[in-house]
């Protein structure tokens, strides 16, 4: 398993331990990708997982660009439409830098 997959596993386990439920993982469309689709009650939570090594450039929180946010929004909209889901949603980020995990609710 590569470091990105390990980071996604760690993020998923952390979110599940805090009461969220996994709906889908690694959802890919030609115009964007969703790392994790979770649910917290009725709310669909689209999660971007970012991983950086401690010696890497910057930390994981700084790694989500405006263009990536736009692609994730577009992919999430498509996911909701394809699955005929009419529910509130939000966009979270799990940033992992080395051993440190930071969960940012409503990241954008």
Swiss-Prot record:
Pfam families, per the entry: UPF0102 (PF02021)
Membrane-spanning ranges: none
Disulfide bonds listed in the record: none
Domain of life the protein comes from: Bacteria
MF-aspect GO terms: nucleic acid binding
InterPro entries referenced in this protein's UniProt entry, alphabetically: Restrct_endonuc-II-like, tRNA_endonuc-like_dom_sf, UPF0102_YraN-like
Family affiliation: Belongs to the UPF0102 family.
UniProt-recorded name of the protein: UPF0102 protein Sama_3355
Species of the source: Shewanella amazonensis (strain ATCC BAA-1098 / SB2B)
